[in-house]
């Protein structure tokens, strides 16, 4: 049973997504709060599933496959919803596009490399990028309530969320470039062996 807990958490993160979308569209404070809580739970399980798998030595191929997919689904869904409702707008949309584009490119690269049995390990900077993305999205989801709780003169929850979104977009570019470079190097070295 212990071996299954990390995968159950990962699958649970995917199952949360439709409920998150539903809560996002519920009107009023309780809809916003429910969407925020679901996003935070999903974000926390991202940390928890990997930690438990490593701690108990129960890492699995299924977890290796599903974990990055679950991350991308929740982050992409949240970013799209925040753009659609105007929370992320104007030039800020560029940061969301950078994040989404990188996720698609790296997913394709990982799939391509997996065919050659080449693993592309997650870097510490990529982990930091994910944390920044999730914190920025949580702040943006917190809405007016978050702005009342976090309000330092010119910086409220929304402003800090946008700043962190841009920081995560910058890290996204850097880590995306690093992964692409390593992936292309692997692919070219494999071609040279043939």
Question: Residue spans of the language-model regions?
Answer:
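C-terminal membrane-associated helical module and adjoining short loops/tails
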Residues: 1-7, 17, 27, 35-43, ...
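Membrane-embedded alpha-helical segments that form the functional core of polytopic membrane enzymes
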Residues: 16-65, 78-98, 156-171
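Core segments of transmembrane alpha-helices
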Residues: 12-19, 70-79, 106-107, 129-141
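Residue-level signature of the transmembrane alpha-helical core
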Residues: 14, 37-40, 69, 97-100, ...
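Membrane-water interface of transmembrane alpha-helices
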Residues: 104-112
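Hydrophobic alpha-helical transmembrane segments of integral membrane proteins
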Residues: 2-3, 11-15, 64-67
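Residue-level signal for threonine
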Residues: 10, 60, 123
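Active-site His/Glu-centered metal-binding helix of metallohydrolases
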Residues: 15, 44-52, 69, 73, ...
């Amino acid at each position: 049973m212990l071996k299954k807990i990390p995968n159950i958490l990962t699958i649970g993160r995917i199952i949360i997504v439709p409920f998150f979308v539903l809560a996002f569209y519920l009107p009023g404070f309780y809809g916003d709060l429910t969407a925020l809580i679901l996003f935070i739970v999903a974000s926390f399980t991202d940390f928890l599933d990997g930690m438990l798998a490593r701690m108990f030595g129960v890492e699995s191929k299924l977890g290796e496959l599903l974990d990055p997919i679950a991350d991308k689904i929740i982050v992409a869904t949240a970013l799209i919803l925040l753009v659609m409702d105007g929370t992320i707008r104007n030039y800020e949309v560029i940061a969301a596009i950078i994040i989404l584009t990188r996720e698609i490119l790296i997913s394709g690269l990982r799939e391509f490399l997996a065919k050659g049995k080449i693993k592309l390990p997650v870097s510490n900077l990529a982990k930091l990028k994910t944390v920044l993305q999730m914190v920025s999205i949580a702040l943006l989801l917190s809405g007016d309530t978050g702005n009342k709780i976090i309000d330092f003169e010119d910086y409220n929850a929304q402003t800090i969320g946008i700043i962190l979104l841009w920081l995560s977009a910058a890290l996204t570019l850097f880590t995306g470039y690093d992964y692409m470079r390593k992936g292309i190097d692997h692919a070219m070295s494999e071609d040279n062996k043939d």
